[in-house]
Amino acid sequence: MKEYVYADYSNAIGKFSYNIGLGLENNHYKTATNERFNYLVFRPSVVLNVQYNKHSAMKFTAAINSSVPNVGDLTNSIVTIDEHFYSQGNTALKPYYYYYANLNYQYASDNGKFYIAPSVTYSYYPNKNMPVLFTEGDDIILRMAKIDNVHSLGASLSLNYKPVNWFVIQPFYNYEYSTYRTPNQVVKHNLHNAGIGVQFLPKNWQLMWNGNMPMTLVDGDIHTRMGFNMSASILYKFKSMSVGLEYIYNPNPSKIYADINGFSYSEETKWNNFKNLVSLKFTYYFYKGKSRGHVGKRISNSDKDSGLININTAK
């Protein structure tokens, strides 16, 4: 169960505006072994904006964020991965705070044909819960553990180019440098994530293509390699109905691996149906009565913690 309270204050002075907020979150957990956990965390934040003109703006966000252990990582049960290789929860895990800062710039041309948004992000974790491999006799145990002094520096760039009304190109690039030390190794990782989207929008038609290049994520001692994937779709809209066709190509969804002194392993996801997946969609829209919505005031208190972790989730 989760309770969340949030309050903020906003003001504007000429081209400048700011927002100061404070959130309070209380989490209640009960594991399968009837162990109970109660975590109370604070989430303060500051946002500064400057609107140079109608084409460009800059935003700076600073926050002290928090992360709460999920149920699966707290459960002190053992899952067999392979012979002499196990995963086990850690009941000693605690919530942790981390410092987050982001500087974002946005520019849009007067005619709406060009948009660019570069940003720089830095996060510092005095300590962070990360998956670590431990040697216990002849066995290897994968367990979440507290890792000190985790640094993350990132940059991103997204573009939107619309030379004509019915054609849009949307490339993006993300970079992140992470560094920390586990009991097994010093990690210095460079993440490169790039992709592009193309849209053709002639009259009632919508044709889209998206491609994402391979990338490798790191978390503690564990690396995850995501393969190249792409999708293409065509949609035709007529009055209150639409019919479309989508094609997904994702032959190598992910590969999880680790390599430490005296031990290495890899686990690869193989979903052959995603090598060439085709789906057909038909939609009919109808409305009855009146509806009212306040999109800007909606909040979400949904809790998606199923208690599952990577090790005990079907692949």
Give the predicted meaning of each segment.
Residues 5-11, 24, 46-50, 101-107, ...:
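Residues on the lipid-exposed face of transmembrane beta-strands in outer-membrane beta-barrel proteins
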Residues 66-117, 142-153, 162, 269, ...:
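Outer-membrane beta-barrel signature, preferentially recognizing the C-terminal barrel domain
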Residues 1-2, 88, 94, 109-172, ...:
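Outer membrane beta-barrel strand-and-loop segments of large Gram-negative receptors
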Residues 13-15, 24-30, 38, 62-68, ...:
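Transmembrane beta-strands of outer-membrane beta-barrel pores
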Residues 237-315:
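C-terminal beta-signal and adjacent terminal beta-strands/loops
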Residues 1-35, 39-45, 49, 54-101, 122-137, 166-175, 250-264, ...:
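Surface-exposed extracellular loop regions of Gram-negative outer-membrane beta-barrel proteins
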